[in-house]
């Protein structure tokens, strides 16, 4: 019996083995090439790793979402099923590997773009922080300014070592927080003065103001110890309440207090008109308030009118800032052109007259102020622009005063000292750049330590006047033109040995090895003795050019805390 069944068993085993081999061949044929499957899997892993890295360095999910969506779609796809032909499946995995690789490259670009965007934003926010800090230093009525100076130095240090979006986001957050607090100092100080004036009027009316004077003293202590926006907001609320209480307690002085409030409102209405804003509604309110105050005979009457006036003053605050910010840009341009045309530079090279004040005109700092206004929405943003504009007006006065100063470029200038005093820079390191002289003087703690001739921006793209902080330092670097080939402003990729960014948007203090000549007049068309008329025969594109060895000295003797003052 065993001999009879043995051939059948062998036949069955052979058939089973054949089926297994055939099935394996079939599965292999339908699954695609193993190498392409592995490559697709590896590329997906690489993409996932890079996405996690992007999230880890602070790239917002919103910027990564298109890639995440595409990856999800790829993950939910599957290889085609075909009999006895693995080429379609192989093609599928090859395409999958390619798409994952493309998405990886896209994520790398997103990381780079996000880093650049947040770096620029941090530089802009730090510039606004510095402007607000300078304004309050100049006002000299807030004794706790040192706390904000320390915070600025700390943020500046963070900016010097920042690498990732999350670093720049944190710097922007700190800068905005401090700027918001600084922007509340002036309104709070005005409220304090109003309260003090009210107490003074009550005292003049022979009223007992002992308690109110004690309140004012306590308020001043709170004011000078404030460090956060909430500190100033709470003090402002308290002052409003104290002012209302003062009105209740001062029936004899109410007519004087009401008149003072009305005068404040009148001044703001006049400012709206000056700025070209529609003040018709507020003008009507003013007339009604004047009539109401004349008729007022009780505390409640005065309180009601005062409350309405204060409501209007509050409501027009943002409108005033917006109007002033837009008005001052044109006003600066007008002032710069008026003086510049009366004191033009006559260029013997081409026989034309040029503005020495081009940096203050609309193509100069005006372009950048208008650009800032283009993304300005909050009161704090408008205030930052106004701070910068007021600085520009002062700097323009310094240029005008320095124009007729016969002092040699390598000696201390009176206008330099005024700049140091006005901006409280006596204990700082300052690169003081005179556009009228085309000279740079370096001051350390108020003392002149070095002087160099420079070349600043041409009339079409002047250097930007103002007091700036260091926003980046690079050695070496390569500059690439944003203008198309054929443009008079285009230049080929250029190696730079030493570069210090003084204003976001690509404004540097740097070496210009292609130039031979520097100093007065080199910001206008001229014959450069080095023979390069294409790139050396005119001013820069807004940068401050220096001889290479001098730029090396400046780079080596400065740091992230150095101030660049251009006037």
Model-flagged regions — what are they?
Residues 2-13, 30-355:
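Amphipathic alpha-helical assembly segments used for oligomerization, scaffolding, or translocation
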Residues 10-22:
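Sec-dependent N-terminal signal peptides
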Residues 40, 64, 93, 115, ...:
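Solvent-exposed, acidic/flexible segments
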Residues 52, 76, 157, 225, ...:
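Sec-exported extracytoplasmic/periplasmic mature domains
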Residues 287, 291-294, 304-370, 406-407, ...:
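Exported/periplasmic cell-wall-interacting domains
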Residues 366-431, 442:
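Long amphipathic alpha-helical scaffold segments
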Residues 408-526:
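Gly/Pro-biased beta-strand-loop elements
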């Amino acid at each position: 019996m065993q001999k009879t069944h043995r051939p059948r068993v062998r036949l069955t085993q052979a058939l089973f083995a054949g089926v297994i081999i055939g099935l394996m061949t079939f599965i292999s044929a339908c699954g695609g090439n193993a190498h392409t499957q592995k490559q697709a899997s590896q590329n997906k892993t690489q993409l996932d790793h890079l996405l996690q890295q992007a999230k880890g360095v602070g790239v917002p999910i919103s910027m990564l979402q298109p890639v995440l969506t595409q990856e999800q779609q790829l993950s939910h796809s599957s290889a085609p099923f075909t009999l006895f032909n693995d080429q379609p499946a192989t093609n599928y995995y090859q395409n999958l590997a390619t798409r994952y690789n493309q998405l990886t490259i896209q994520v790398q670009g997103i990381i780079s773009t996000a880093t650049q965007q947040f770096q620029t934003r941090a530089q802009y926010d730090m510039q606004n922080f510095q402007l607000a800090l300078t304004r309050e230093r100049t006002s000299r009525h807030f004794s706790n300014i040192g706390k904000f100076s320390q915070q600025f130095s700390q943020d500046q240090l963070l900016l010097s070592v920042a690498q990732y979006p999350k670093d720049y986001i944190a710097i922007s957050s700190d800068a905005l927080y401090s700027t918001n607090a600084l922007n509340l100092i002036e309104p709070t100080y005005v409220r304090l003065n109003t309260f003090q004036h009210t107490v003074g009027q009550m005292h003049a009316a022979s009223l007992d103001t002992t308690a109110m004077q004690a309140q004012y003293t306590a308020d001043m202590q709170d004011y000078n110890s404030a460090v956060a926006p909430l500190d100033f907001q709470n003090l402002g609320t308290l002052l409003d309440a104290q002012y209302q209480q003062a009105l209740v307690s001062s029936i004899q002085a109410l007519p004087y207090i009401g008149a003072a409030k009305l005068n404040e409102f009148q001044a703001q209405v006049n400012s709206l008109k000056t700025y070209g804003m529609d003040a018709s509604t507020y003008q009507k309110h003013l007339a009604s308030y004047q009539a109401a105050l004349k008729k007022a005979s009780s505390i409640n009457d005065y309180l009601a009118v005062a409350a309405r006036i204060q409501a209007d003053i509050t409501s027009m605050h943002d409108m005033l800032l917006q109007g002033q910010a837009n008005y001052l840009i044109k006003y600066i341009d007008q002032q710069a052109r008026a003086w510049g045309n009366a004191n033009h530079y006559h260029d013997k090279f081409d026989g034309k007259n040029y503005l020495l004040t081009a940096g203050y005109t609309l193509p100069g700092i005006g372009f950048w102020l208008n650009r800032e206004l283009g993304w300005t929405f909050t009161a704090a943003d408008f205030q930052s622009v106004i701070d910068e504009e007021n600085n520009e007006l002062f700097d323009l006065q310094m240029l005008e005063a320095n124009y007729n100063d016969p002092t040699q470029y390598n000696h201390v200038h009176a206008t330099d000292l005024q700049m140091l005093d006005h901006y409280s820079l006596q204990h700082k390191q300052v690169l003081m750049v005179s556009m009228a002289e085309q000279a740079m003087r370096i001051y350390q703690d108020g003392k002149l330590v070095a002087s160099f001739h420079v070349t600043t921006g041409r009339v079409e793209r002047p250097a930007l006047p103002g007091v700036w902080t260091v926003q980046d330092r690079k050695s070496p670097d390569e500059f690439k033109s944003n203008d198309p080939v054929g443009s008079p402003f285009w230049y080929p990729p250029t190696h730079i040995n030493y570069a210090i960014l003084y204003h976001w948007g690509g404004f540097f203090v740097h070496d210009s090895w292609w130039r031979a000549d520097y100093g007065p007049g080199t910001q206008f068309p001229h014959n450069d003795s080095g023979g390069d008329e294409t790139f050396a025969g005119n001013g820069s594109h807004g940068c401050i050019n220096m001889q290479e060895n001098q730029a090396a000295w400046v780079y080596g003797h400065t740091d992230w805390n150095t101030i660049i003052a251009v006037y």
